[in-house]
Amino acid sequence: MTGAGSSRTFARWFRRRKAANAGGPKVALFATCSVDYNYPQVGVAAVQVLEKNGKSVEVPRVVCCGLPALDGGDLETAIGKIERNVAVLLPLVQSGTPVVVLAPSCGLMMKSEWPQLVPTDECRAVAAATMDVGEYLAKEKAAGRLDTNFTVPQGKVAYHIPCHLRAQNVGQPFRAILQSVPGTTVEAIEQCSAFDGTWGMKTEYYETSRKCAGKLCSAITVSNADKLASDCMLAGLNIVEETGCAPSHPIELMRDAYGLRQE
């Protein structure tokens, strides 16, 4: 999982490719701004994994979830983005399509903050249909609908469990999935990256953020893992800054475990 801009956006890649599994169970993929503009390969991996499991993936024309605006105290902008997204997502939700999110911070915003800021039945319905991608795949696995024919071992994986995923109370879904890959062990690291939305980006808090991420980065260093994973792209910025190692999103490791080539 690398970042710092990309020559292609995820949305552009998706709309130029041939759709798969027409008529299969639909999934609305809320890619997030980070994936669309900086980490398109995470979105590509998610599409590959979902399509491997027979899903018909749709990427609706949504806008930012509103978290950066809310983080900066701009409620008017945040509410405007929420209302716009609800209008796009509601018809999908009403047809029984789950909304699957690729970044924990955005998923937490959609599940928890959206219905508080826009307390309508429509917004509550969209929030209730929203799931983290790992949460969704774990439910598919529990229902016997997940392809578990993994063929490529991933070795020892140091897996950072982001705070905003833990706040969703969905457990550690990707940990269980990756541990089912032959030749793979997962060491979960539950330490804060101290990025905290946009807080860690600000000049006045940058050094404090780096210092607070010390426990996480030390745990990663001493793990001596073959691979490093985190669901949170923002956490990855502090991780790579302090350790020199860029984490993959767990969905990328899952794609690799299937033996699928990177598109």
For the regions a protein language model found, what residue spans apply to each?
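Iron-sulfur cluster-binding electron-transfer modules in prokaryotic oxidoreductases
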Residues: M1-E263
